[in-house]
């Protein structure tokens, strides 16, 4: 489906953006999150310049995204290492099983 215009209110300003219908709810949640972040920043920093608040919020969001990407990379590397260890353990167990007779007195040919 093609994108459709969506009207948003960001920190008291109207903004119209195009968005696929199936992503409309996610966009609305993102706008709500941004509004909350801007409001929190305004209260915490006492900055009244909207443009400055938007830049600070953008930097914070970018930093959080960078941190999450690093966590994801670290997690993927950790899982890859665990999978390799499990694979080696399984391969060794299969090799050991092939070397060990299943019943006492059974001999390999």
UniProtKB/Swiss-Prot annotation:
Primary subcellular site in the record, as a coarse category: cytoplasm
GO biological process: division septum assembly; FtsZ-dependent cytokinesis; septin ring assembly
Alphabetical keyword list: Cell cycle, Cell division, Coiled coil, Cytoplasm, Septation
UniProt-listed Pfam families: ZapA
Cellular component GO terms, alphabetical: cell division site; cell septum; cytosol; plasma membrane
Protein's UniProt name: Cell division protein ZapA
Cellular localization per UniProt: Cytoplasm
Source organism phylogeny: Bacteria, Pseudomonadati, Pseudomonadota, Gammaproteobacteria, Enterobacterales
Family per record: Belongs to the ZapA family. Type 1 subfamily.
Coiled coil: 21-97
Record has ATP-binding as a keyword: no
Chain's role: Activator of cell division through the inhibition of FtsZ GTPase activity, therefore promoting FtsZ assembly into bundles of protofilaments necessary for the formation of the division Z ring. It is recruited early at mid-cell but it is not essential for cell division.
Cytoplasm in keyword set: yes
